[in-house]
């Protein structure tokens, strides 16, 4: 228990929680090549991904795996509760037409990622049973995150997080996945998973390399 609740770990977990909240709001931009600046000037391009994976890695490297675990669990709990509260009030106040915009602003569900507008196969489930459907979206992200980190042999996921929490989430969500298999929108669900995860993997590699370099420089300057 001391590993989870020491002062340093709690502080890093709070920092990580704030990083996770802000990371969805900040979109990644890259510039053109430096040798093009004299002719074309400095131009930036959006690569349609965010800093969420980078914030996880940053806290894992500097704060440790337990701080990363606590901040991740806290962030997911906050997101799920906010989704439930927003859906409850939007139904009772008859403002459900504002639901996508409210979700985008408060819990940073970017419509470009397809969570509300393009992810049509669970759009109705988000309205009717939001927190269960939201686990489906996060499970896909967790799978990509877990596989990516294992390839780069980082310390962000320890045996407890990898074997216990992920296993329980997968076990708990089997009923939802079974209902999706009988849905007419199964093709949309599969195409969204491919589009949002595998095609954006090079963009995530940019974040991984940037965070590793930043952490290396910070540790080199401090130690």
UniProtKB/Swiss-Prot annotation:
One of its GO terms (cellular component) is chloroplast. Keywords: Chloroplast, Plastid. It comes from the Eukaryota. The keyword Plastid applies. It is found in: Plastid, Chloroplast. This is Uncharacterized 26.1 kDa protein in ndhB-psaI intergenic region. It comes from Mesostigma viride.
